């Protein structure tokens, strides 16, 4: 039976990864955080938070920031009706950054998080609702990731890539492999069950990569069943000035 989100009693946290320094967008982001750039009439974070909040399943949004931009995020959070907690990871330069996986664990430890978690990058916009992804993950009852078909080999080399079976279960995941096995790319949107969120430190201790957010998921899929949902729309990645201009010109919101 397919459940509507309103029928689900689950409450979760949403952790937004926003501690990067976006050096490829300099000078635009030299003194301003990329997740607060405007796309249309809203910031990137507004698009993400307002959409997810519509499911009424997230009781707290957590923005993990570096020290350099923590005040920017706090000022933004103060304008929002949702409960938003900003966590400062203490870093001030790109060279001393913790990396996404260590940032996740840092936020978990600082706030004592022990819930299911939606973990997302704060520098992408989508033209579909993440509520569909939450519904998929709740029905699978496992940790989950999104996937989309990427035809260009050059882009595969810079991405997380998954191999799946006929039931969407992830068999393998690699980050930036020189020999990607498939064309299924994974953008940085993850759903972790409470049990699997407790294993992040174990993944770090086992040697999983810590810079790319998908590195923990790549380790996790070797430990427990996890699934990958095909994206029902498009993702717009803002990596440099040109891609930001392109997104500004083409993005039409969530539909």
Feature names for model-found ranges:
Residues 21, 123-124:
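Active-site metal-binding loops of divalent metal-dependent hydrolases
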Residues 134-138, 169-237, 241-255:
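Catalytic-core segments of class I nucleotidyltransferases/pyrophosphorylases
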